[in-house]
UniProtKB/Swiss-Prot annotation:
Residues 1-30, 262-310 are annotated as: Disordered. Residues 35-102 form the Histone-fold domain. Ectopic expression of the histone fold domain acts as a dominant-negative mutant resulting in differentiation inhibition. It holds the Pfam family Bromo_TP. This is Transcription initiation factor TFIID subunit 8. The modification N-acetylalanine is found at residue 2. A motif (Nuclear localization signal) lies at residues 294-307. It comes from Homo sapiens. Induction: Induced with triglyceride accumulation.
Amino acid sequence: MADAAATAGAGGSGTRSGSKQSTNPADNYHLARRRTLQVVVSSLLTEAGFESAEKASVETLTEMLQSYISEIGRSAKSYCEHTARTQPTLSDIVVTLVEMGFNVDTLPAYAKRSQRMVITAPPVTNQPVTPKALTAGQNRPHPPHIPSHFPEFPDPHTYIKTPTYREPVSDYQVLREKAASQRRDVERALTRFMAKTGETQSLFKDDVSTFPLIAARPFTIPYLTALLPSELEMQQMEETDSSEQDEQTDTENLALHISMEDSGAEKENTSVLQQNPSLSGSRNGEENIIDNPYLRPVKKPKIRRKKSLS
């Protein structure tokens, strides 16, 4: 009978566990606890004289047993916390059973019954050993003011500053070799840069790019730029020369034009004077005055020189 009930309970739990194949440890723990309760219910049914049981009945009894045990634990925890304790004791469980209407005096006789079935412990499967994580340094223990149930400190390298730097080299020979190699590298880099950006000469006529040499350039006099006029000064000098030339040509053209007009006017005046001799006296007085301002000779402005203080 026990085998039949156990088979029914195991079959139900096996179907349940088979339908929920989970790799989560919490889910596996709940499935194992449920299966253990089903085995206990099957053994109780066998002690009561049942030879077989339906799956729904076994599940209902399992749920009732689980709820009963959960209520005992919850009530014991509440009584424990009311007395300012964190862990329940036997007295808390006894008070809980009494409050739930259970006769505590019948427990010793029930534990010593003759038809008691011994449930063997389930086989323990060796869990795969997880490799330990790589640790750097030694873990720091808790100080006296931190309770032991607090989590441990993480690895020291996660929160302790560990600067990594090389010690400076102080050997004289090593420093000289390092300085020489750096100077040689800088010279090579500068030579390559000058060969790529400037004019070069080659030792071989056939292959120009094999051994490029920097073309020699004559040295310029450093103070020559200060002696030579700048572009702005040259431009100003050119503008001044061009303006003087324009003024000179304008003056020459104006003088030529005036002379031509004077000659024409003299011819006209002579012809008029020959016809009217009375106008000759008044015309001679007006010859020295020019009414047209554009025909007057150019007068340069007077340059005012500053008196030097002696």
